[in-house]
Amino acid sequence: MSRQTQAIIHADALLHNFKALAAIAPSSQSMAVVKADAYGHGAVNVARILQHVSSQFAVAIIEEAIALRDAGISAPVVVLEGAHQAKECQMAFQHNCILVMHCEEQLQWLNNCPENQRPHIWLKVDSGMHRLGFAISDIEDMTKKYRHLLSEQTVIATHFACADDVDNGFTASQLSAFKRVADAIGLPTSVANSPATVNWPASRNAWNRLGVGVYGGAVSTANNVGVEIYPAMTLRSSILAVRTIAAGEGVGYGQRWVASKPSKIATVGIGYADGYPRHCKNKTPVMVRGKRAFLAGRVSMDMITIDVTHIDNVSVGDEVELWGQNVPIQEVAACADTIDYELMTRVSQRVPRIVKYL
């Protein structure tokens, strides 16, 4: 490996975070959500790391589930978007996947499958987010009409719009609306994602779906959430070149950064083709030789430039942390006007994922 741009995946952090979040709800079962290639961390590796603590996994689409099966992951897999086409019902049965059904068309597809070749299903209720799910007013009738498709593994699920915001009352209204129909139907429920598990005790039901928190992402607007989680990814690269420029000289495309004094500029081998956000502003932090340096100029496809004037002995080959244990990913996301979820999932496939234990 010539280029030193890598995403280090911290296996111990993944295990710690999952166990810490699951411990908040000891009466519930918890599953790790590994959709979007485990939020950019590598779904197969993450599933292998967590398979002894997470009895099920969740993905978004059937292709993600099959990739786990092809890698030898045998635990049940919940497909959160259900079937996109009728043929996926058969695929789910063949691969021991649980489909989360959110509309009657999907139930009709399932009904058309041979009776002995139907996968287990969950049912999703729209409690107010208005993306996917049966309407609150329809779900009881749907469970009666399609009772023959349900099994001992069927769960009623919903999803929150604002669970990370402890001051937003909409989550309480979603919980109340969902609880009314769930109590009437009488099936086990799955409500909590990572933020809800931390912030909303009433949402901790039969199954909690632990996603971004497992990877060290932000789970709450509160300052003290009562659980300590650690970043599971360190994105790092190395310095390709160091040069000194005079006051008044510009750096990068568009000359967006201009030196106010003689400055030392380091070029780093990572860019937006690797998933480092192009919209990062000047002064976005990185870590070099134990000190913070700052973005100077626009992010290029394959490189960034940083101001290291204040750091001694910077040289070619020095490691640069873009985010991770010393530079919080949330801070970088704020500099790019986005969220940590997006940064994690956009790390491109040309960046190797290197799994490490402490």
From Swiss-Prot:
Keyword Ion transport on entry: no
Sequence intervals crossing the membrane: none
GO terms under cellular component: cytosol
Protein's UniProt name: Alanine racemase
Pfam families for the chain: Ala_racemase_C (PF00842), Ala_racemase_N (PF01168)
Encoding gene per record: alr
Membership in a protein family: Belongs to the alanine racemase family.
Entry-linked Gene3D superfamilies: Alanine racemase, Lyase, Ornithine Decarboxylase, Chain A, domain 1
